[in-house]
């Protein structure tokens, strides 16, 4: 069953690019929660020693947001059971990343900034609305972090509650905040500015230019040239 309604924007002979993007977003989310579910059902204690890293925000747009509420409930439930599941999502593009470029250079090294709803709407989204940003779509709070002059980043950390991350932003509301911040310097990559090694390695594996698939495409292209 297409619970997200992806088929509604499709016709018999056409599907917009957004369908593929939405499908990928759901797939990535389900994939990162697969090991979490496995350990939760078999050995919860292992989750205390794990950090799950997602390439992109902890957010699901439009109809995909149906998943955000149960995800928030899971994080809250796990915390109530004494299991603080550590997860981050790193944003490398978009309005929050663009804003980081404006404020990052003047921010002190070792600083962390959690914007509230007013700041997000006025300074980043440039809206006049008082609506709570991401209350239905996000399952993580946005943070601007400057570890050093080379590593400045926008990351998301779950809170387990709807909208709390912008109406009353606080480090205490961020699940496993201290352990996450302590772990970040250990997984930095110096290959790219603001890069995290797990994401860099994942993107490297997915790159066609790195693995045999690139050679396959090259052979296919050469064969076509000869015909």
Placement of each model-derived feature along the sequence:
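Long, contiguous domain-sized segments
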Residues: 2-227
């Amino acid at each position: 069953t297409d619970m997200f309604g992806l088929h509604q924007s499709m016709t018999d002979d056409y599907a917009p690019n957004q369908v593929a993007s939405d499908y990928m977003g759901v797939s990535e989310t389900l994939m990162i929660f697969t090991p979490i579910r496995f350990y939760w059902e078999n050995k919860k204690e292992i989750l205390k020693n794990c950090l799950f890293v997602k390439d992109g925000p902890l957010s699901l747009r439009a109809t995909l947001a149906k998943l955000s509420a149960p995800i928030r409930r899971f994080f809250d439930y796990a915390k109530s059971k004494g299991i603080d599941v550590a997860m981050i999502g790193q944003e490398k593009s978009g309005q929050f990343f663009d804003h980081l470029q404006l404020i990052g250079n003047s921010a002190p090294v070792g600083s962390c900034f959690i914007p509230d709803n007013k700041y997000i709407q006025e300074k980043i989204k440039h809206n006049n609305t008082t609506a709570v940003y991401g209350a239905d779509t996000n399952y993580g709070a946005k943070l601007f972090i400057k570890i050093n002059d080379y590593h400045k980043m926008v990351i998301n950390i779950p809170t387990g509650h709807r909208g709390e991350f912008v109406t009353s932003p606080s480090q205490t509301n961020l699940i496993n905040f201290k352990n996450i911040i302590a772990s970040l310097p250990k997984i930095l990559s110096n290959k790219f500015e603001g890069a995290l090694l797990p994401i860099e390695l994942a993107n490297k594996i997915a790159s066609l230019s790195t693995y045999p698939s690139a050679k396959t495409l090259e052979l296919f292209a050469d064969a076509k040239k000869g015909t």
